[in-house]
């Protein structure tokens, strides 16, 4: 595997329920490196760009309304195979179908309140990182335990 970056966002339901620390901890314990982090209430314009692939879907308006309804914690994580690993840690989109031990399986309520968003592939990750972060907001650093993280 190669070192890559992914975009994750703790949605307003996760922030309001006080799950930020729990979720951050899962990715830290997995050994991934946090290179970008900010909390914001997304603008309608940002939300519409982020969910643009769903523009023609009947749930688009509700999705945009929800993600702009409160604070979101936007993050960029880095590591070997981080995109696929993050998807596995997050679990299925529908919490009732997500495996126990995953974020959505343990913490999600329903498809509309599933706590977290994660990029689904390299192209999406690149698009979402560029949409939510300026390059100056991303930090290149090496953890002191780096030699224990990668071969």
From Swiss-Prot:
The keyword Repressor does not apply. It catalyses: a 2'-deoxyribonucleoside 5'-diphosphate + ATP = a 2'-deoxyribonucleoside 5'-triphosphate + ADP; a ribonucleoside 5'-diphosphate + ATP = a ribonucleoside 5'-triphosphate + ADP. Keywords: ATP-binding, Cytoplasm, Kinase, Magnesium, Metal-binding, Nucleotide metabolism, Nucleotide-binding, Phosphoprotein, Transferase. The active site is at residue 117. Pfam families: NDK. PROSITE patterns: NDPK, NDPK_LIKE. It is an enzyme of class 2 (transferase). GO terms for cellular component: cytoplasm. GO terms for molecular function: ATP binding; metal ion binding; nucleoside diphosphate kinase activity. ATP binds at residues 11, 59, 87, 93, 104, 114. It is found in: Cytoplasm. Its cofactor is Mg(2+). It comes from the Bacteria. GO terms for biological process: CTP biosynthetic process; GTP biosynthetic process; UTP biosynthetic process. HAMAP family: NDP_kinase. Major role in the synthesis of nucleoside triphosphates other than ATP. The ATP gamma phosphate is transferred to the NDP beta phosphate via a ping-pong mechanism, using a phosphorylated active-site intermediate. PANTHER family: NUCLEOSIDE DIPHOSPHATE KINASE. Belongs to the NDK family. This is Nucleoside diphosphate kinase. It comes from Prochlorococcus marinus (strain SARG / CCMP1375 / SS120). The gene is ndk.
